């Protein structure tokens, strides 16, 4: 058991292996990249039911108010998302790069919008684990993005990491609530 109370089936070596295997990004000059990890007290199937919905990211991403999809959820499908006020953008155009229901991996690339996240791409992968004796999910999300003129790599990574951390916290809150409902309903 780790100091934070998480009994983890995915040891640090397994976590590194998941990152090595699923989170490959080719960086060029003037880009930054980072990988974030979140442990969620809900089974993979519940977390994946939210993450895989390329057509409904607003289900767990608090900064998205609306999403319109052009395509039929195949690789190359494009979505137009409206961003809530308070962020330095109003819309983003994103393309589905990978949707793997067996390995639980989703990858997107931003292809347009009125923001400064140029050449942004991200990969999110889910992995089963045990947390405090219960079935849980290890979520790994990585990204690469151009550093905008006038910003440093650290500033850019900090900004994107803050957005992803908010998304992952929301994903955890919603997934854990759904897991409790699922457990309660299965007892009835």
Curated annotation (Swiss-Prot):
It comes from Arabidopsis thaliana (Mouse-ear cress). Belongs to the PYR/PYL/RCAR abscisic acid intracellular receptor family. This is Abscisic acid receptor PYL8. InterPro entries: Plant_def-hormone_signal, Polyketide_cyclase/dehydratase, START-like_dom_sf. Its main location: cytoplasm. The gene is PYL8. Disulfide bonds join 32-157. Abscisate binds at residues 61, 89-94, 116-122, 141. GO terms for molecular function: abscisic acid binding; protein homodimerization activity; protein phosphatase inhibitor activity; signaling receptor activity.
